[in-house]
């Protein structure tokens, strides 16, 4: 056989649902890569003969290979920090109170408007490197810290540039509808007009976004405004998603499902009717335990209902300066299990196959299958559950992206 590389002495957590074993596991396995794709995988005993003198062979020393991790919800590009708000919350102020007093998102908006693209790029590069060291091979990055046309475009341009200069694939999301900027404080509908009539066309003209998101909440955008933005995005051919039911149940998830959104994110206050709507539309539920933890919330997402209705559950970092300044997907695996009571298998699926579904890229990445992109990680672990069980010592040994060894 003519391959570019072969991996032996490994176990595979394929996350292939057609394999009945937990994690879609194949133990005592091997895998071959050709032209950036997975060319063969299966039991080591069935590996076809190949020229060991001309094809590089990598020995996994009994470790586990998983698909490359996918962080499907981040706000990775921003300037400044909000440590002062952290102190205020510990003194009793709520996230909502801080936001209504001009803090929160708006304070980061000010810092991002003042920062240039070079500064934002370097900050983003450092954060992307941190995720990459934990096995992340695809990341979603949202705008939303500009809230004016110029700065929203600036953030999205930086995200696109990161994707061009880093081995991690970057999917971009336009989140102009993240908060009401101060200049539109008493005219939120006017700001929605600006998003639809000026911002969105400018984003599309430069091909800066793969999707559009809205923060549907009582401190941000109401249902009517949310539908206007998402409908405009959908009409332009972009994927849509929604921050919904984080602080209250406004019915945003049902709206997103009706419009065919790829995902609804946060969903702590989602009810059974909303879960049923997601199930019927095939919309993913993105769980963000980092924000739940950091804001010291008590209302948990309806995990049992999501299981009951078969809604794909995704885990993501929600890395951002205000509610989840936690740049770690491995920690999300642990938090998903300890805080939301996911199983380790559900958690890993939420950072691989289901995360790919949330971004609409599941045909190419998210599981180990012949013909899929060769994005995978070798972990120094005895069982896949260890990825969620223990945190602090990074067990990621090798990362392969598009068939190339990028981290060793």
UniProtKB/Swiss-Prot annotation:
N-formimidoyl-L-glutamate binds at residues 145, 320, 322. GO terms for molecular function: imidazolonepropionase activity; iron ion binding; zinc ion binding. One of its GO terms (cellular component) is cytoplasm. Binds 1 zinc or iron ion per subunit. It is found in: Cytoplasm. Zn(2+) binds at residues 73, 75, 243, 318. It catalyses: 4-imidazolone-5-propanoate + H2O = N-formimidoyl-L-glutamate. 4-imidazolone-5-propanoate binds at residues 82, 145, 178, 246, 323. Pathway: Amino-acid degradation; L-histidine degradation into L-glutamate; N-formimidoyl-L-glutamate from L-histidine: step 3/3. Its cofactor is Zn(2+); Fe(3+). Keywords: Cytoplasm, Histidine metabolism, Hydrolase, Iron, Metal-binding, Zinc. Its EC number is 3.5.2.7. NCBIfam families: hutI. This is Imidazolonepropionase. It comes from Shewanella baltica (strain OS195). The lineage of its organism: Bacteria, Pseudomonadati, Pseudomonadota, Gammaproteobacteria, Alteromonadales. The gene is hutI.
